[in-house]
Amino acid sequence: MYKLQWNKIGVVAPQEGYEKNIGTAGLLKGVIDNKLVFGGGANFPGGLPVDGGTKVTHKDIYLYEIKDNEHVLLDQIQHDYPIAYGPSANYKDKLYYIANKDESSSDILELTIKNNKLNINIIGAIPLTVENTIAEVYNNKLYFGIGSINGKNTKELYSYDLETKTFEVETEFPGELRSQALSYVYNDSLIVYGGGAAETYSDGYKYVFKEKIWTKLADVIVDNYEYSLLGADWCKLNEDELLVIGGFDKDVWKDAVSKLSTLTGEEHAKYRDAYFRRPVEDFRWNKHELVYNLKNNTWTKLDEINFEAPCGHALLSTDAHIYSIMGEIKPAVRSPYIHQAKK
């Protein structure tokens, strides 16, 4: 059984025009040539929303290399416009990202590295807005969907042909409507887990690309406890296992969504104010290291992380290490840190 030793190895560099980085959530994220690529995301530089703070989305994209447990910034560039909450997909030596360009269209970005410098090419556009969906590349097609398309959650999974630049609806997801699900390609199949809407979801499904068939997978239940994967991220632990970190507490989430959507007037304002001022521990976000065995379709857990449980972070896997990068640690409060664990 794995024992992961987590170390805080640094703070992400400030965005252009800022004195320091307070952290962002909803990141562009991936690994190219064993180097970390992440950026964009959103935060609240002016403080909590109940104190007048407003959400700011950022343009900065970072290229980091980790040498001797030291984080080395190789490159920092700005995209043409701010990006956040779009899906990322690693494929070979490239990273794909779907970026909302305006209120009716998105660009498909292709990120590469040359001479330790980031390059961004816009390789296509689609007449849809895409947020908090999944994305994976298989057989030169970028699959995306099962999340917010044009502002509404959809079960549709689209495929975008990277060669012909055409896209179509591939299939319909069999689970409930949701956003922020997790995805992974394994043995010619698409694995989809979690996400949420008014409630969190712990169910999983497998889509076999060639047969175009969905099957149900094991729910995220360990020691008789059902874990929420909403807001969590996962990455490759080894050839047959994925590591999951973070995620909202299912009961706290459901209660908050219910009250914020049903209370009115002074009661709503009072609850909202108290909600954002709660201490981190009151939100009970998941600190357990969950492990999904792709081969056996089983869930287990290792230990607990030794830092605040994140949501909307980047969990990235290189050859030898795993990195948890930024994210939020409670609603509207972010973390600027990079944490590292050896596999």
Protein language model annotation of sequence segments:
Residues M1-K343:
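Kelch-like beta-propeller repeat domains
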